[in-house]
Amino acid sequence: MPGGAKLPADPGTADEFGDPITPLKKFRSYGNYYEFTRAKTGIREVAADLATSPWQLEVGGLVRHPRVFDLDDLRRLGEEEHVYRMRCVEAWSMLVPWVGFPLSRLLDLVEPAPEARFVRFESLHDPQQMPGQDMAQFAQWVGSAPIAEDCQVCRVMGETVDPATSPYAWPYVEGLRLDEAMHDLTILATGAYDKRLPAENGAPVRLVVPWKYAFKSIKAVVRIDLVEEMPTSFWMRAMPEEHGFYANVNPDVPHPRWSQGRELRFLGEDPEPILPTLPFNGYAPQVAHLYEGMDLTVNF
């Protein structure tokens, strides 16, 4: 089914609080996708030629039945609407009618082994299609130029490093605890707004974990592995003082450079409203028990 094809779903108009969904135009024109550009606007144009079909998602690691899924396999797992709040760590948010299926359905098919405790996700690595993965360009984005044109050694954040060991090494990697991954709210999205996912929003398949900051919701997923040890994510490696493994939305734990107590909600209004941020992005009744007894100021 082509990227603009309609899905058998009717986009919702509001969440459980009665807040309206973000206009599709805003959803497609504003966001973060560093694999393409550091700019928050213009991603659509840069990502327009990304090849998203055919696509394969390999699932392995500590599982009884490793498997490679194509897009038809994934869509056969069900495509239902999930209207979720999406809260960026940068203190802006959207309300998005995703279309997809609980990640648990896929994990049940491969049967995690008893020793599996975490799930590691990996995104597409293709610098020819994703110019932001070109280390020379990325080094310039973060404030310093490469030492050599071929970027065999780059100066990143003031430190001379080899691209292979750079704190900004691609591909993009994320992780969840297994119980988080198996939670009913955690989905793999194949569409949004009653259409297939656009390239700029993570096509053809992305993770959505609505109670966590949006950088956890990795885009263009090509590999999922069940593992025993906590994965080190892209941003944990790049900026560990700002990005923890859990990344639960928490108004009481400020970002080192700004408060997380409020957020700019994109609703298509002028001006856009500023709303109080809710613990776990408003999903505390469903997920707070997962972190019982944990110090969430340390496990951020």
Where are these regions (language model features)?
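Structured, non-membrane catalytic/scaffold regions adjacent to prosthetic-group chemistry
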Residues: 4-300
